[in-house]
């Protein structure tokens, strides 16, 4: 467990405060998890963003009438801190009985509070339900590898040694799997996700990638660090010209977390998948 997470509200009984309380936000430094991967803030081999989508965003108009919307938050992958998920939920719940004169006032408040917690500017979009309905459900790009026949004997830790590639062939492709699962390092609750890998480099053996993804099944770590580990393991193996790893996790507590890591300029579709 991350030392800072021990002091967070995650996994503990919490009072649900219904009026605006920004102090509920609990930042967790990324540095310790970066260090586990041999990284520092100065040596990150990727660009990226963590998309958080909130499906339980509600506040009051000055008249007292409630409003509901979908909140989309983009936290830079290089920010000093992640925001612990339960504290994020408690903070958003504290808006429920708080009046805002305009949507713009709410957006500015969210931007200021979340940016202060993350240590970098956080993007905020407040979207109507009609807008989200019109978008529909997205599908991941490329080939789904989930029907490949593999044998699995261990789930306790990520196993990069399972990965293999054909160095004699250079390919550009996108592949994805819906079999990503890891566990919350604080509560041990399951985190279900889908992951897409896009790259140009030595031809990756698809069955080995699927076995590697499944090896995360009993691994305990935060969503962001799981994606960074996958990115680094593939980068070491493939030595690719380009590499992107993007995971979209199933929501819990009204929030889903979607980490994106890439060697390329950010170009991300934040539309929800079928399980989200």
UniProtKB/Swiss-Prot annotation:
Principal place of residence: cytoplasm
Pfam families: QueF, QueF_N
Subunit note: Homodimer.
The protein's annotated pathway: tRNA modification; tRNA-queuosine biosynthesis
NCBIfam families: QueF
Domain of life, per lineage: Bacteria
Subcellular location(s) per record: Cytoplasm
E.C. no: 1.7.1.13
Catalytic residues (UniProt): 184 (thioimide intermediate), 191 (proton donor)
GO cellular component, one term: cytoplasm
Protein name: NADPH-dependent 7-cyano-7-deazaguanine reductase
Entry keyword annotation includes NADP: yes
Family of the protein in this entry: Belongs to the GTP cyclohydrolase I family. QueF type 2 subfamily.
HAMAP family: QueF_type2
Key words of the record: Cytoplasm, NADP, Oxidoreductase, Queuosine biosynthesis
Primary enzyme class: oxidoreductase
Catalysed conversion reaction: 7-aminomethyl-7-carbaguanine + 2 NADP(+) = 7-cyano-7-deazaguanine + 2 NADPH + 3 H(+)
């Amino acid at each position: 467990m991350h030392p800072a997470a021990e002091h967070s509200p995650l996994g503990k009984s919490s009072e649900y405060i219904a009026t605006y309380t920004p102090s509920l936000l609990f930042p967790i430094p990324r540095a310790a998890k970066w260090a586990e991967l041999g990284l520092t803030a100065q040596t990150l081999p990727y660009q990226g963003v963590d998309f958080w989508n909130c499906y339980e965003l509600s506040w009051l108009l000055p008249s007292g009438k409630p409003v509901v919307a979908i909140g989309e938050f983009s936290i830079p992958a290089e920010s000093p801190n992640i925001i612990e998920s339960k504290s994020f939920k408690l903070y958003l719940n504290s808006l429920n009985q708080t009046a805002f004169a305009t949507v713009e006032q709410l957006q500015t408040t969210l931007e200021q509070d979340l940016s202060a917690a993350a240590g970098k500017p956080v993007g905020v979009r407040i979207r109507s339900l009609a807008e989200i309905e019109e978008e529909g459900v997205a599908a991941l790009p490329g080939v789904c590898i989930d029907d490949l026949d593999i044998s699995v004997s261990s789930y306790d830790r990520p196993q990069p040694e399972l990965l293999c590639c054909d160095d004699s062939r250079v390919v550009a492709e996108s592949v994805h799997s819906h079999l990503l699962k890891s566990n919350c390092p604080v509560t041990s609750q399951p985190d279900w996700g889908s992951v897409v890998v896009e790259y140009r480099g030595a031809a990756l053996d698809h069955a080995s990638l699927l076995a590697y993804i499944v090896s995360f099944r009993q691994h305990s770590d935060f969503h962001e660090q799981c994606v960074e580990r996958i990115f680094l393991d593939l980068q070491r193996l493939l030595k690719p010209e380009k590499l992107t790893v993007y995971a979209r996790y199933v929501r819990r507590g009204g929030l889903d977390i979607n980490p994106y890591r890439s060697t390329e300029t950010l170009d991300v579709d934040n539309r929800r998948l079928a399980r989200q």
